[in-house]
Curated annotation (Swiss-Prot):
It is an enzyme of class 4 (lyase). PROSITE patterns: FERROCHELATASE. Its EC number is 4.98.1.1. Keywords: Cytoplasm, Heme biosynthesis, Iron, Lyase, Metal-binding, Porphyrin biosynthesis. Catalyzes the ferrous insertion into protoporphyrin IX. GO terms for cellular component: cytoplasm. CDD domains: Ferrochelatase_C, Ferrochelatase_N. Fe cation binds at residues 194, 275. Pfam families: Ferrochelatase. It comes from Yersinia pestis. This is Ferrochelatase. Belongs to the ferrochelatase family.
Length: 320
């Protein structure tokens, strides 16, 4: 009888290898070519992507990455590595590997490392608290493509999401309360989630429902009146309508409503990255202050916070 050996594959979106136009062009080409991310016909999308979007966006995005790049590398990779290391320390009997859907470390290498260690029960943990076809489902597709090359397949446990998990809500609550203790209670707490095109939700993606589930659970857990907690969506791209209300437009409008002090958390990001450190902490802060706001504090992602790592361990052990 074959003895079961579990192994964990942690997956996040990915990051360029360097804050340069060349590296970012390579990364964005892979990311934006995934039909789960952009479902426009390749006949229309490929020339637009390679002829217009990549040449124009890559230099601009490179400057943004340079503003947040850490000594150890890209923030997303740095924090994801710390998560992997902390999780492995809590589960020394179970191999834990990190793979990115796009860029490095890539999924084929991570899966190969696990299978080479004799893993027969592969637990896949996409680091997306709220399921979306453009993130979690893309992980499923990528893993399936890798495993097509193997004769002998492991059993698979795929953690779809954890939007309402009590340990996740507790970790978020503690993070918010630490910020309140340090900076005082704000006029508004803004919960900003990454957006997706409205059309994706209309076609069946339950991502906005899962974001609302997280928001409702966190509202109930916090010592702040529900009307002082706002849910928004950020990072829209392209011309079609995305989920609303938009974070940037909301922050620009709040000061005219008498809101002078806000704190902002991004519950859907398991690790800090360009979208939190530059788009939110820098750009959106400026939008709010320029519109007449007085105090803005960004509440960091859970990163390698002890409560976050404990949550991830619970998710994994429940699926072994």
């Amino acid at each position: 009888m074959m003895q079961s050996k579990p192994g964990v594959l942690m997956v996040n979106l990915g990051t360029p290898d360097a804050p340069t136009s060349k590296a970012i062009k390579r990364y964005l080409a892979e990311f934006l070519s995934d039909r789960r991310v952009v479902d426009t016909s390749p006949l229309l999308w490929w020339p637009l992507l390679h002829g217009v979007i990549l040449p124009l966006r890559s230099p601009r995005v490179a400057k943004l990455y340079q503003s947040v790049w850490m000594e150890e590398g890209s923030p997303l990779l740095v924090y994801s590595r710390r998560q992997q290391k902390a999780l492995a320390a809590r589960m020394p009997d179970i191999p834990v590997e990190l793979g990115m859907s796009y860029g490095s470390p890539n999924l084929p290498e991570a899966i190969e490392k696990l299978l080479a260690q004799g893993v027969t029960n592969l637990v896949i943990l996409p680091l997306y608290p709220q399921y979306s076809c453009s993130t979690s489902a893309a992980v499923w597709d990528a893993v399936a493509r890798v495993l097509k090359g193997y004769r002998r397949l492991p059993s698979i446990s795929f953690i779809r999401d954890y939007a309402e998990h009590p340990a996740y809500i507790s970790a978020l609550k503690q993070s918010v309360e630490r910020s309140f203790a340090e900076h005082g209670q704000p006029d508004r707490l803004v919960m900003s989630f990454h957006g997706i095109p409205k059309r994706y939700a209309q076609l069946g993606d339950d991502y906005p429902i899962r974001c609302e589930d997280t928001s409702r659970a966190l509202r109930a857990a916090l010592p702040l009146p529900a009307e002082k907690i706002i849910m928004t969506y950020q990072s829209r791209f392209g011309r079609e309508p995305w989920l609303t209300p938009y974070t940037d437009e909301t922050l620009k409008s709040l000061p005219s409503q008498g809101v002078k002090h806000i704190q902002l958390i991004c519950p859907g990001f398991s690790a800090d990255c360009l979208e939190t450190l530059e788009e939110i902490k820098e750009q959106n802060r400026e939008f709010f202050l320029h519109a007449g706001g007085e105090k803005f504090e960004y509440i960091p992602a859970l990163n390698d916070d002890e409560g976050h790592i404990a949550l991830l361990e619970q998710l994994i052990r429940h699926n072994i």
